[in-house]
């Protein structure tokens, strides 16, 4: 098996702002694994919040190149378990590698990934489209630029309720709110009341990740469901979220790929938690991998490639929130 690493700098359509940062370009690592005439592709993007850079990921993968290239024809579970000890401090690199291996494995088997997992896709949820923090006029213009059935609105400002009130005047779409750890306990509970009146479906990670007492209080008193994001990073976190959140948002780059992400979703479902997968600002390589988990999800946020000025791959397509699969096997990706 041959490992190929590529670095890209993805240009965004608009400056993207959340409560922590603003970006115009998104650095991205694409991993390709070649074997027996097949190629599998995976992706992970840089993330300043987690101190992840593309050169760092490449360096971590280069260190174990021989181990990766000598591990072939194992199931993705066995492959992940073998590689995890070497990359346990770089889950982003592990994710890109795991996505590529799952893609390659399914292509060798002659199946789409969701077919290999025996999933049926008739009830797949629609993806939301993210509106980053900006002036209200800019946020309204972003909505008008792309009419969509569900919007995820990034908040964490002093005018959050006013922003949502103003946006609501311009659309009947479902709203989801992501405060990116920007609120306190009372603020979250009070905001939930106001936001429910404004047609908000749920709140995502309103408070700091480690505020477990606060999460429990909000869980009891919020009139809207609350979904964990930063509080649910790796497999061990799912059980902690029980009785503290109504659901979990799994990010593949944070947990180490599709292999552990799939297990996290299965555990969440057993615990009666709502399930969601979220994306980063990334290309169709990463987004196409997420698509194969859709049959297991209540919600999904996989609009990352829609935020790009120019994509670097083809794969799944998204129109008006509805995800359509590529005709190709594996995750269905082709690099442009």
From Swiss-Prot:
Extra remark: Part of a large, functionally divergent protein family. Protein modeling and substrate docking were used to predict the substrate specificity, prior to biochemical analysis.
Function according to Swiss-Prot or TrEMBL: Catalyzes the epimerization of D-Ala-D-Ala to D-Ala-L-Ala. Has broad substrate specificity and catalyzes the epimerization of a variety of dipeptides containing an N-terminal Ala followed by Ser, Thr, Val, Met, His, Phe or Trp (in vitro).
Organism: Flavobacterium johnsoniae (strain ATCC 17061 / DSM 2064 / JCM 8514 / BCRC 14874 / CCUG 350202 / NBRC 14942 / NCIMB 11054 / UW101) (Cytophaga johnsonae)
An annotated Gene Ontology molecular function: racemase and epimerase activity
Protein name, entry field: L-Ala-D/L-amino acid epimerase
Binding site for Mg(2+): 178, 204, 229
Superkingdom per UniProt: Bacteria
CC cofactor note: Binds 1 Mg(2+) ion per subunit.
Keyword Isomerase in annotation: yes
EC category name: isomerase
Family annotation (SMART domains): MR_MLE
Any one Gene Ontology BP term: peptide metabolic process
Chain residues that bind substrate: 130, 152-154, 251, 301-303
Pfam families: MR_MLE_C, MR_MLE_N
Enzyme Commission number(s) from the entry: 5.1.1.-
Cofactor(s) for this UniProt protein: Mg(2+)
Family: Belongs to the mandelate racemase/muconate lactonizing enzyme family.
Keywords: Isomerase, Magnesium, Metal-binding
């Amino acid at each position: 098996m041959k490992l190929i690493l590529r670095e890209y700098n993805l240009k965004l359509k608009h400056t993207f702002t959340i409560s922590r940062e603003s970006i115009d370009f998104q650095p991205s690592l694409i991993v390709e694994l070649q074997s027996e005439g097949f190629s599998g592709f995976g992706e992970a993007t840089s993330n300043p919040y987690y101190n992840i850079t593309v050169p760092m990921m490449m360096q971590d993968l280069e260190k174990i190149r021989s181990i990766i290239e000598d591990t072939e024809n194992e199931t993705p579970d066995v492959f992940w378990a073998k590689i995890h000890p070497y990359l346990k401090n770089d889950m982003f690199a592990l994710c890109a590698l795991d996505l590529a291996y799952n893609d390659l494995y399914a292509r060798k088997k002659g199946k789409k990934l969701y077919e290999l997992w025996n999933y049926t896709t008739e009830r797949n949820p629609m993806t939301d489209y993210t509106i980053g923090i900006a002036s209200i006029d800019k946020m309204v213009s972003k909505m008008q630029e792309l009419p969509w059935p569900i919007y995820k609105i990034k908040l964490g400002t002093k005018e959050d309720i006013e922003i949502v009130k103003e946006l609501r005047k311009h659309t009947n779409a479902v709203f989801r709110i992501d405060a990116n750890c920007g609120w306190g306990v009372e603020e979250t509970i009070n905001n939930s009341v106001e936001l429910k009146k404004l047609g908000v479906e749920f709140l995502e990670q309103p408070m700091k990740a480690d505020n477990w007492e606060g999460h429990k209080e909000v869980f009891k008193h919020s009139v809207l469901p609350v979904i964990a994001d930063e509080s649910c990073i790796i497999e061990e976190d799912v059980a902690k979220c029980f009785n503290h959140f109504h659901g979990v948002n799994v990010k593949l780059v944070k947990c180490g790929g599709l292999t552990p992400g799939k297990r996290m979703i299965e555990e969440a479902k057993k615990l009666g938690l709502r399930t969601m997968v979220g994306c980063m600002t990334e290309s169709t390589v990463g987004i196409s991998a997420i698509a194969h988990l859709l049959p297991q999800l209540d919600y999904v946020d996989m609009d990352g490639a829609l935020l790009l000025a120019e994509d670097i791959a083809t794969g799944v397509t998204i129109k008006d929130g509805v995800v359509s699969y590529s005709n190709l096997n594996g995750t269905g990706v082709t690099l442009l």
